[in-house]
């Protein structure tokens, strides 16, 4: 994985973990995501890329009562707080409009081979968010842009705009105009 190769090239001490993406769900959630726990000066941090939904924009220190990270609560990004129960960790997310459980994981190193069945499930299961629609997210210096299923959300400068992409042409136009992704064919 590219993220792990980058961490390794900079000499970081890290290990992969298997993550459940909760996003406030009260239903049982299958673990389908990979993140890394990086240790710096004896402190473990949750680091994540490629989540496709609101993921931490900074490494989150896994210290109980650490407070929100980053400290500034913004409508454009979620701030995170770690809740630890032994080796079990839940990260709570908060922005100006929502506060909810975001991800959970166990502080146990995973092997990359452990992700093969998770990747298969995420790409094939009817209940997987990946098979239910498009997931795209991009961070900018002023906010985020995302498409989840058929909803386009653009956040910048403390404002958020949402709109439903009603047709395939609307989706293709948004992918091109907002993300620079050109889709051809059906």
Protein language model regions, located:
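Cysteine-centered nucleophilic/redox motifs
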Residues: 1-18, 36, 136
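His-Asp-centered catalytic microenvironments across diverse enzyme cores
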Residues: 19-163, 169
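Generic C-terminus detector
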Residues: 168-186
């Amino acid at each position: 994985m590219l993220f792990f190769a980058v961490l390794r090239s900079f000499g970081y001490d890290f290990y992969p973990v298997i993550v459940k993406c909760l996003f406030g769900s009260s239903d049982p959630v299958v673990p389908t995501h990979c993140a890394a726990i990086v240790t710096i000066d004896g402190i473990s941090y949750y680091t994540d890329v490629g989540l496709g939904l609101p993921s931490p924009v900074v490494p989150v220190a896994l210290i109980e009562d650490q407070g929100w990270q980053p400290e500034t609560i913004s409508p454009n990004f979620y701030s995170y707080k770690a809740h630890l129960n032994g080796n079990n960790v839940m990260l709570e997310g908060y922005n100006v409009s929502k506060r909810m459980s975001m991800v959970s994981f166990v502080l146990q190193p995973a092997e990359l081979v452990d992700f093969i069945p998770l990747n298969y499930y995420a790409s094939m299961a009817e209940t997987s968010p990946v098979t239910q629609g498009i997931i795209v997210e991009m961070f900018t210096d002023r906010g985020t842009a995302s498409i989840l299923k058929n909803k386009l959300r653009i956040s910048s400068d403390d404002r958020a705009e949402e709109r439903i992409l009603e047709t395939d042409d609307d989706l293709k136009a948004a992918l091109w105009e907002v993300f620079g992704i050109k889709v051809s064919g059906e």
